[in-house]
Amino acid sequence: MLTRKLINVISTDMENLLLKYMGERLEFSSAKYKHLGPVITISRESGCPGNLVAELLANKLNHKMIADGYPPKWKWVNKEILRQASEELKMNPRDVETYVKARESGMLHDLVASFTESYHVRNARIKKVIHDLIRNLAVEGHVIIVGRGGGAIAWDIPKSLHLYLEAPLTWKTNKVSILKGISVPEARKLVLERDMQRMKFRDSYRTKFSDEIYYHERFNCKSLTGEQICEMAFQAAELKKLV
């Protein structure tokens, strides 16, 4: 009988094989995209204020553009990507979000379905559409992408800045416990599950080249406020000439 780990490996390999024949190209040349962007990506662990930092940073970047005599162009996106993906796929947004949050459920019928062609075709289509939406946003530039594998997808664009928000497990657990109104043990379990799901989702977009990526800046959300993170990220964006 196949183990869960082996089934997961087979499932992932089948989806990646389908993506190859559907024409997805995940390997890019940095030289080809040297004039594209600028783009900032924010990857984060559970409880960390990714949306807040993105909003503050977009506002600060736009104020800089206005002060320099240019119209404001910066925006930030997160769940909008899932909405656009669901529209393009003609699927219920909840189905797309379910794919993002957990590519497996542990339910027996899902386990059986994971070996059917339609299951893998659907997942490959969702993965490709999300990839293409994020890639297009990154190429167009002046965008801050929160989560969704943005760092792995936009890794090769020279005019980019990749941020990672992290914190100790105890801090994240207490934060989620308060935000969700659940017990500390429940929050701890949720944090561990979500962080694992996010890591798997990011890894699903990695290539043999993007495996070499390191985040430009990592921030400890326990000891830094959203405003402080925004200020340091803004300085990094200036140093990298994104503004």
Regions found by a protein language model. Name each.
Residues 60-69:
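Post-Walker A helix-loop "phosphate-sensing" segment adjacent to the P-loop in P-loop NTPases
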Residues 42-57:
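Glycine-rich phosphate-binding P-loop
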Residues 156-192:
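Conserved phosphate-donor/acceptor-positioning beta-strand/loop module used by diverse small-molecule
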